[in-house]
A protein has these predicted regions:
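Catalytic-core helical/loop segments in enzymes performing group transfer/polymerization on anionic/lipid-linked
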Residues: 2-688
């Protein structure tokens, strides 16, 4: 018999898996303060079809208890007395960046009508699924395999507050996993400190002479709880690891893994280990672990993909905080990748230099969630402050002229806003680069590395890039998303020539002989005497805010049409080619399968996707396809910020926000400042 999950409401909309909220709410009574105070938990429960209620339950109602917490007895007693069912609630196996005790809300819950996944004395919904469900659906197992690879590659775990720069010892070791003292899973297993000491002794006995690394729980490292091991257990060959390190890095260096019942044992299975298990967790007994206390009822042999599919795809309910809806596992991975990256970048704090006053509140929102940014105007002072306060240093890219600078350079991203930066509309996308900056080819950048590495994408990355490509081309999104619809343009061989800001950093660093809009127009006309040339001035230049004007007389001689205040996406659908110095419109044209000719060395040139008349760096020898270029440029490289939830977010959320003028528009203060700057356009140094 196939057990029914707590929620059965997933359906597929093209490539996207959608989870619908329940249409009717069942009363769920609770007697635990956590259900009252945790807003996101209450919201997930509501979307799952439960109405959290105080009082006494009636027949047909349910009582909620939190796992096997010490105060669960109240719920058990009332459920028994009122003869109603129990619903056991627990965090899902991927929870958040930081533990709940540190304040992060959950991204998923487990709702179990039968038992607790960590208590083997009574079967739970997950165990029933692992026992009886065929778990043989090809699409389900494909999703599981892809998610396992993705989780390992991106270092995603239940908690994710660790830096990827931290590495375990270089020498091989036996990994022994500690757990929080008195945890419900430990109590359910009927074990204590003596059993943890026995586990450590077994690891020493079975691996004589080997180094042993004891991994502390995240809450132990943060000082929120204590564990079963301490510094007293350290010897010449035993080390207590109290530094937050990715579990996936730890598994790479481990010759064996020992655990009582930690979720890290499950992750060890996903990493290819067969862990020694001394407790009776949900992942024991299926032929994937070496069980010291075998469970007689678990006789089935499962694959890693089957175990993962049940535990991570079918069993939990997942929540999307951006769209405020239930979602699939893949959406939670999008969320955790974005939020974990932000924490890993920002948790040490930043000293920020070269940031204009109007940008600072928005930069504070994006980069200052862990520690507020310290702003400095002088680069030398910023460097000293960075060293003194042990913070990282970020510099607006155009303000850092030193190519050898160790600072992280910051610049607007490629899906920026609905409106221009020069009109003080804050960006929803920013890039940070520790090597260089994407527009300057004189030095390698992180984007350049990512494009080179995108020659080979995983299947899940290809699927995501394809979906994003379709979203961008269907919605017509570009960097700024402004302007009117282009007029109908007829004729053969229509060439778009995008104007640029002539003192823009990409012009100053990535062009050769042709570095003005007039020189560009002249060169394109000389090379294409019979083509229809469409000149589109840069919107900042049109507004009188930046340099780069081509006179009406000059443009009338060289171009067939001059198109002002036009949304470029409506123009790209009507042209055959784009000829440019370094404009981002060249990249946007590639996304729409147009021929692109470059006179400079923009980030997208030199990879075999453009016809290059300039001199891209010879080091660009990789040959990614268009999806590889898109994945590196729009998914892997930038950071995105959701103006609605004020959270780091995946690119797909920004795509949706950019279609909503209210979500992605001006703040009232910046709207006033923008109008004032228009009056002071000739004094741009005051506001740029």
């Amino acid at each position: 018999m196939r057990p029914q999950p707590a929620i059965s409401n997933q359906y597929r909309d093209g490539a996207r898996l959608i989870v619908k909220p329940m249409t009717t709410a069942r009363k769920l009574f609770y007697y635990n303060g956590g259900f009252l105070h945790q807003k996101q938990l209450r919201r997930i429960m509501s979307l799952a079809g439960y109405k959290l209620t105080l009082g006494l339950p009636n027949p047909g109602d349910l009582v909620a208890v939190w796992g096997q917490s010490p105060n669960q007895y109240r719920g058990h007693w009332l459920a028994k007395k009122r003869q109603v069912g129990l619903l056991r609630v627990e965090d899902a196996f991927l929870r958040s960046v930081q533990p709940g005790r540190a304040g992060d809300p959950p991204l998923g819950l487990i709702l179990d009508r039968s038992g607790c996944h960590f208590d083997a004395s009574h079967p739970c919904d997950l165990e029933n699924m692992l026992r009886y469900d065929p778990l043989d659906d090809a699409d389900l197992l494909r999703r599981a395999e892809q998610a396992i690879v993705r989780i390992r590659h991106n270092h995603i775990s239940k908690y994710n507050a660790f830096e990827l720069t931290q590495s375990p010892p270089a020498t091989r070791y036996v990994l022994v996993i500690d757990q929080t003292f008195g945890d419900a899973a430990i109590r359910a297993s009927g074990v204590g400190k003596a059993e943890f000491q026995d586990m450590l002794a077994s690891a020493r006995r079975e691996h004589p002479g080997a180094n042993i690394l004891i991994k502390s729980h995240a809450e132990i490292i943060m000082g929120l709880r204590r564990g079963y091991f301490s510094a007293a257990d350290e010897t010449d060959t035993i080390r207590l690891l109290t530094t937050p390190i990715s579990p996936w890095k730890l598994f790479e260096g481990a010759i064996a893994v020992y655990t009582m019942s930690s979720q890290m044992g499950f992750e060890a299975i996903l990493a290819g280990h067969k862990p020694h298990v001394f407790g009776q967790p949900f992942y024991a007994g299926w032929g994937l672990s070496k069980d010291r206390r075998p469970l007689t009822g678990r006789t089935r042999c499962l694959s890693r993909a089957q175990l993962f599919a049940a535990a991570m795809i079918l069993y939990p309910i997942w929540y999307d905080p951006y769209r405020d809806q239930l979602c699939a596992l893949e959406d939670v991975l999008d969320t955790l990748e974005a939020q974990s990256r932000a924490w890993r970048d920002d948790h040490r704090g930043w000293v920020a230099c070269g940031m204009r006053l109007w940008k600072r509140p928005h930069l504070q929102s994006i980069f200052g969630r862990s520690k507020r940014l310290i702003f400095q105007n002088d680069l030398a002072k910023a460097r000293r402050a960075s060293m003194r306060k042990q913070r990282n240093l970020m510099v607006w890219a155009s303000a850092d002229k030193d190519l050898a600078s160790p600072a992280v350079r910051v610049e607007d991203g490629f899906l920026r806003s609905r409106g221009l930066g020069a009109t003080l509309i804050p960006p929803l996308s920013l890039v940070t680069d520790r090597l260089g900056i994407y527009y300057d080819p004189r030095k390698p950048s992180q984007l350049e590395q990512m494009i080179a590495n995108a020659v080979t994408l995983r299947p899940d990355q290809i699927t995501r890039a394809e979906r994003l490509h379709q979203q961008i081309t269907t919605t017509g999104l570009t960097k700024y998303n402004t302007g009117k619809t282009a007029p109908n343009i007829t004729g053969t061989r229509r060439i778009l020539v995008p104007g640029q800001v002539e003192d823009d950093a990409s012009i100053l660093t990535a062009t050769g002989q042709i570095k003005t809009n007039l020189a560009l127009l002249t060169a394109v006309r000389r090379a294409n005497p019979d083509a229809i040339l469409l000149y589109k001035p840069h919107p900042d230049v049109e507004a009188g805010l930046r340099r780069g004007v081509v006179s009406d007389r000059q443009s009338a001689v060289l171009a067939d049409r001059v198109l002002t205040n036009i949304n470029p996406s409506t123009l790209l659908t009507q042209v055959d080619e784009v000829w440019t110095m370094t404009s981002l419109l060249g990249f946007e044209a590639l996304l729409r399968n147009k021929r692109v000719v470059t006179y400079g060395a923009p980030f997208y040139a030199g990879w075999g996707l453009t016809h290059d008349l300039g001199q891209p760096p010879t080091r660009r020898v990789a040959r990614p396809d268009l999806l590889g270029l898109l994945y590196a440029t729009l998914i892997a490289y930038p950071r995105y910020f959701d103006p609605v939830t004020r959270l780091p977010c995946p690119v797909e959320v920004v795509i949706e926000r950019l279609q909503d003028s209210e979500a992605a528009g001006h703040s009232p203060i910046n709207r006033v400042l923008s109008k004032l700057q228009g009056l002071w356009a000739s004094h741009a140094s005051l506001w740029r």
